[in-house]
Amino acid sequence: MSSGPADDPTAARAAPPNGAVRAVVTICNQKGLHARAAVRFVKTAGQFDAEVWVRKNGTEVPGSDIMELLMLGAAPGAVIELTATGREAEAAVMALARLIECKFDED
């Protein structure tokens, strides 16, 4: 897990909100962020008192919306940035990064 933009590091982007926790992760399961993986992501995100956002190539979507996550088209090898705010933001980002790094417990 590392910190930094998920898209081109030279691209202009809005700064994350104060107190936001961020992590950059690579989708490493065989099917990418598909329907079952998105459901697991949303369920995990929902366990925390935090607002989670997912960013890929400059597009940012709420981590609570399965359809929006699917629309990111995060295939295997895609680099995404997780950002969270709220009381449990750090725990949420850590759990989501771990879920992704564990290939959504699929492979």
What is each model feature region?
Residues A20, E51-W53, V61, L72, ...:
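Protein-protein interaction regions
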Residues A75-D107:
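C-terminal structural segments of small proteins and small subunits
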Residues S3-G4, R22-C28:
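Non-catalytic helical/linker scaffolds that mediate oligomerization, partner binding
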Residues S2-A12, V39, K43, I66, ...:
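Long, contiguous binding/interaction regions
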Residues M1-S2, D7-A11, K31-L33, L70, ...:
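Generic signature of intrinsically disordered, low-complexity, basic-rich segments
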Residues N18-V24, V79-E81:
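Intrinsic-disorder/low-complexity, polar/charged segments enriched in Ser/Thr/Lys/Arg/Asp/Glu/Gln
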Residues T26-P76, T83:
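Compact, glycine-rich, soluble single-domain proteins
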Residues A12-N18, G46-Q47:
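Acidic-glycine-rich active-site phosphate/pyrophosphate-binding loop
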